[in-house]
From Swiss-Prot:
Belongs to the allantoicase family. Keywords: Hydrolase, Purine metabolism. It comes from Nocardia farcinica (strain IFM 10152). Gene3D superfamilies: Galactose-binding domain-like. GO terms for molecular function: allantoicase activity. Its EC number is 3.5.3.4. Pathway: Nitrogen metabolism; (S)-allantoin degradation; (S)-ureidoglycolate from allantoate (aminidohydrolase route): step 1/1. The gene is alc. It catalyses: allantoate + H2O = (S)-ureidoglycolate + urea. GO terms for biological process: allantoin catabolic process; purine nucleobase metabolic process. It holds the Pfam family Allantoicase. This is Probable allantoicase. NCBIfam families: allantoicase.
Length: 329
């Protein structure tokens, strides 16, 4: 069987894949049955959880997470529903109980749904057709609890259940974006967008920032919202490989160095790999400016490209990469 770009995912653990639920990708915690001690929205904050001892509010110690009241032997469990910022295939989750020591749940479970449209949150929570992805499993307190998920279906929402109650700092839902196929093909598309199904396969260096952020929606908000490499002390250069949303024809490349001032690359080059394995040059080595959204027309290529490699010279940081074109071709 011929290898495709979809098969060439870097052989790392699932935590190297993007977090589909994170707030910066548009994720939202749309419902929870209880959030007495700490708000449900904290579950998907992109930053790591923090703790300030002896910091009390009207309801006790302040926790950076989602925390419910004690059940005290009463029946029932607590649950929260998360709408994924990028619907997709879930490869694994991390249930992070950092700083929750005497108040973490003994066990959790996870289920999912694929929903069309935008029904009310209460209607979604009340549905009875949730599909189990993770049966009831024990978790440790003050720890990152990773769980691989074998499902390869596309999901839009997940439901996290605590058995019976307690607190969780963060929920990370790692996977690959899968867009609504009904929306693709309606016009030009960003073939490098995570929300359209693109994925970073590999990169030379990720010292200061994750390369997955290159494919995030919207503009970067600060330097840390992009990909930045360490300073090179050799004659090489840094690079990143991206699997496109699907085979297509790239017409326009946007290379955004916003917020990178003294650390933007001096130049960049873009090459593509067609569906038959041929390498083609889409953008020759081209100078870049600091803190600038560059837009370059790409070379006309007759065959569809399914994967690209962006080389930066010699190192530095980029905020976003956009590759506009059409699927197919």
């Amino acid at each position: 069987m011929n290898e495709t770009a979809a098969d060439r995912v870097a052989p790392r653990g699932f935590t190297e894949l993007p977090d589909l639920a994170v707030r910066s990708l548009g994720g939202a915690v749309i419902w929870a049955d209880d959030e007495f001690f700490a708000e449900k929205e904290n579950l998907i904050v992109p930053e790591a959880p923090e703790f300030r001892p002896a910091t009390y509010g009207h309801r006790g110690q302040v926790y950076d997470g989602w925390e419910t009241r004690r059940h005290r032997g009463l029946p029932g469990d607590d649950a929260a529903v998360v709408r994924l910022g990028v619907p997709g295939v879930i490869h694994g989750v991390v249930v992070d109980t950092s700083w929750f020591t005497g108040n973490y749940p003994p066990a959790i479970s996870l289920s999912a749904l694929a929903i069309d449209g935008y029904p009310p949150a209460a209607d979604i929570a009340a549905r009875t057709d949730w599909v189990p992805l993770l049966d009831r499993v024990p978790v440790r307190g003050d720890a990152r609890n990773p769980f691989p998920i074998p499902s390869r279906d596309r999901w839009t929402h997940v439901r996290l259940t605590m058995h019976p109650d307690g607190g969780i700092a963060r929920l990370r839902v790692h996977g690959e974006g899968r867009p609504d196929p009904a929306l693709l093909g309606l016009g030009p598309v960003d073939l490098a967008a995570l929300e359209n199904g693109a994925l970073v396969l590999d990169c030379s260096d990720r010292f200061y920032g994750s390369p997955h952020q290159l494919l995030h929606p919207g503009n970067a908000r600060r330097m840390g919202d992009g990909w930045e490499t360490a300073r090179r002390r050799d004659d090489g250069n840094d690079w990143v490989r991206i699997r496109l949303a699907g085979p297509g024809l790239i017409r326009l490349a946007e290379l955004d160095t916003s917020y990178f001032l003294g650390n933007s690359p001096a130049a960049a080059r873009l090459t593509g790999r067609t569906t038959d394995g041929t390498e083609v040059e889409l953008l020759p080595r081209t100078p870049l400016q600091p803190d600038t959204r560059h837009r370059f027309p790409t070379a006309a290529v007759a065959a569809s490209v399914e994967e690209v490699r962006l080389d930066i010279y010699p190192d530095g940081g980029l905020a976003r990469v956009r590759l506009f074109g059409e699927l197919g071709g």
